[in-house]
């Protein structure tokens, strides 16, 4: 009953959300921050510094290596691109690292079928100390980004007060809309207010932003992934209703392809972010990423689930004494995704369960697929016991859909 109530609230809440027609499914793309941070030493490290070259090379990889065609279309600049403001107050990029300007990068991205995102901060300075967007500069900066043909703005919240943020984020949303250019708006607003009511009014946030950071920045470690997941689970009854087409909770970037996650942990982050209907922003070096990590990030069924048009955020539905957790996301056409997640740190665990225990209704027969192995699930009745073998800190993920009129069933006992 609780799950049905939350689903109803989610559908009602969507009527109150920002409707600029953008991001009807969670955005996908590449974002510089986690992997490249604020590396501005282009003399010592020209290949990896925050520069025009870096973003053009990542754009090439997105276009040529299959990413764009799967939906990874955003190429997002983060902090440390700004050179200052000119005599009229307009933002200018660093002239040495971005010699051709941001409009040039936008044109380059667009020529490859990509979209360009940019970063600023609702405060006197960005988090790394570059000129921010103060309240008196909101309209000017919005007009500048539109003139540069930018497609997304991430607006951080360092060096600002709660009062400035409460005024500034809605003001920027209005200013972006006034430009006439479709610019998706990514906000850090809730994260700076603690992420929860009463300090955060999610109805107002969702009426202002297309996506928003709720919690701490992700770091390149499994501990960081778990801390974010735990926070989302603890507050899922608050967070789930406000997420949906055009307005998404953002647990932060994907770490896959970097240094802090094992293979199973990488699969787990991808599966869990997918079931949370999270934006999928990679932040890795696409020039050197391994085939193994490409397979995780380019898994077509995972992407299909993430991009489901209903846009319902999944939730934790079952927690066992054996430290196995089950997450479910409801999808279009009565389909669903299940993630069996192991919190164990010892050895692969045989988890025994049935769909009935997971509150699937009697009277249906289900078919589907193991998302990572491709194994087919056929003729599964809710009453049927099954076993999944889950690696430590790993996942098994299923895509299921009901098949009507099927009176007999067969199924592999272990998937």
From Swiss-Prot:
A Gene Ontology cellular component where this protein is annotated is: cytoplasm
Active site (record annotation): 156 (nucleophile), 217 (proton donor)
SUPFAM superfamilies, A to Z: (Trans)glycosidases, Glycosyl hydrolase domain
Record's superkingdom?
Eukaryota
Coiled-coil annotation: which residues?
Answer: none
Task: Tell me the InterPro entries matching this sequence.
Answer: Aldolase_TIM, Glyco_hydro_27, Glyco_hydro_27/36_CS, Glyco_hydro_b, Glycoside_hydrolase_SF, Melibiase/NAGA_C
Name of the protein described by the UniProt record: Alpha-N-acetylgalactosaminidase
Taxonomic source organism: Rattus norvegicus
Q: What is the lineage of its organism?
A: Eukaryota, Metazoa, Chordata, Craniata, Vertebrata
